[in-house]
Curated annotation (Swiss-Prot):
The macrolide antibiotics FD-891 and FD-892 induce morphological changes of human promyelocytic leukemia (HL-60) cells and have cytocidal activity against tumor cell lines in vitro. FD-891 produced by Streptomyces sp. MAFF 225003 and MAFF 225006 inhibits growth of rice and alfalfa seedlings and may cause russet scab in potatoes. SUPFAM superfamilies: S-adenosyl-L-methionine-dependent methyltransferases (SSF53335). It comes from Streptomyces halstedii. Pfam families: Methyltransf_11. This is Methyltransferase GfsG. The keyword S-adenosyl-L-methionine applies. Methylase required for synthesis of the 16-membered macrolide antibiotics FD-891 and FD-892. In vitro uses S-adenosyl-L-methionine to methylate a number of biosynthetic intermediates in the synthesis of FD-891.
Length: 278
């Protein structure tokens, strides 16, 4: 356990590192992904739909799995700059709480809900998913969109999400994973991607059922959408050029290679899963 910060949340060293990364990279990430700050979903991977449109479809994929209704309390673990949380509140009438370790992203998220008139239904906390500052059985629904890659201990985070989820509640996760067997070359590519993304590690897709079970949850669905998300790689590459003033041409080229190599990797994976609390 790390020291409590001023907002009463327990932060470990890696969570602080992730928060610092998102504080510093916020504008880059918004240039890369638009305000969704997550991968896109292409039903036809050969299509040329823009990333902004595909990003909205990814949010919809999670929404369809959560079955959210008006009156539900929803937790968004790793909420980014708050666009999916605001979208969900508008779409369903639910009350949404976002948790994030980046102060800069939270500032943007709070400005968003103020400008959209959603302050009565959407709020945000500086909070570490390893030690969620909420009482047991607090939420009807939880989603975690691409935040699991930053978690030092996925078992701990799964237990925490299960703890704050009410009996009968539902959890949806979107996560970047690996598939198949990784040789030395693939391992090096994954390590380069993790360094670039400040990811602790990538889980193997085959390990997720056990993670869900150990947390005391029932796995309802696990879908491999690797090919439907792979177009995110080339769609994002041009945005790295905004780093030219700070990294120079060589640094940007290295970053593009680390990013592009991951999406070229056969073992690249992306999973959508839904779990329920008995």
């Amino acid at each position: 356990m790390g020291p409590a910060n001023s907002e009463g949340t327990m932060f470990d060293a890696f969570s602080r590192e992730v928060g610092d990364y998102y504080d510093q990279a916020n504008e880059l990430l918004r240039a890369m992904f638009t305000d969704n700050v997550h991968y896109g979903y292409w039903p036809d991977p050969s299509s040329i739909d823009p990333l902004a449109e595909a990003g909205e479809r990814m949010t919809e994929q999670l929404y369809e799995r959560l079955d959210v209704s008006a009156g539900h309390k929803v937790l968004d673990v790793g909420c980014g700059v708050g666009k999916p949380a605001a979208w969900l509140a508008r779409k369903t009438g639910a009350t949404v709480k976002g948790a994030n370790v980046s102060r800069n992203q939270l500032e943007v998220a709070r400005d968003r809900v103020r400008s959209e008139g959603l302050e009565d239904r959407v709020s945000f906390d500086l909070a570490d998913a390893m030690h969620l500052p909420y009482a047991d059985d607090s939420f009807d629904r939880i989603w975690a969109i691409e935040s699991m890659i930053h978690m030092p201990d996925r078992d701990q985070v799964m237990r925490e999400m299960a703890r704050v989820l009410r009996p009968g509640g539902r959890l949806a996760i979107a996560d970047i994973v690996v598939r198949g067997t990784l040789d030395d070359v693939a391992t090096a590519v994954v390590e380069g991607f993790c360094t670039l993304s400040t990811a602790r590690s990538l889980e193997h897709i085959d390990n997720y059922p056990a993670l869900v079970e150990k947390a005391g949850l029932d796995l309802l669905e696990l879908t491999d959408v690797s090919e439907q998300t792979r177009p995110t790689g080339p769609a994002v590459l041009p945005a790295f050029d905004v780093l030219l003033p700070t990294l120079g041409e060589e640094g940007v080229a290295q970053s593009k290679k680390a990013w592009g190599d991951m999406f070229d990797l056969p073992q690249y994976g992306y999973v959508l899963l839904t779990a329920g609390k008995p």
